[in-house]
A protein has these predicted regions:
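Structured alpha/beta or helical-core interaction and ligand-binding surfaces enriched in interleaved
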Residues: 1-118
């Protein structure tokens, strides 16, 4: 599946999505723009050391959880590219999709690892 197919498939399966900014003190202007684009959909911004597919040791990152709606889908789609483009400094990292609290699609961008949870 390509990026757009994954986004569309997840729109049917999921109602939330998240991404990660590992170093909030070193956020790029592109990442700031993306945070602004999704500000109306924000459910939660938390600093933590783990999220689906990743566990940090001795560090934390900001995980942003959003409502996944038709409009959010359209914004993600308009950003174009591929899942591998979701990496600092161009975009936040590790785009994941959930049904309520349950991860459905997980990406570990820096390892080029993407999968649906069974």
């Amino acid at each position: 599946m390509n990026y757009n197919e994954i986004l569309l498939n997840n729109l049917r399966l999921c109602n939330r999505f998240s991404f990660v900014i590992r170093d909030f003190n070193n956020i790029s202007s592109m990442e700031k723009d993306i945070l602004d684009m999704f500000s109306h959909f924000l459910i939660l911004d938390r600093e933590c050391s783990s999220w689906p597919g990743t566990r940090l040791y001795k560090k934390t990152a900001h995980v942003f959880l959003y409502k996944y709606t038709q409009t959010a889908y359209e914004i993600l789609e308009s950003l174009g590219g591929d899942l591998t483009d979701w990496i600092h400094p161009y975009r936040p990292e590790e785009l994941c999709f959930y049904h309520n609290e349950q991860p459905i699609f997980v990406s570990i961008t820096h390892e080029c690892d993407f999968y649906y949870v069974e």
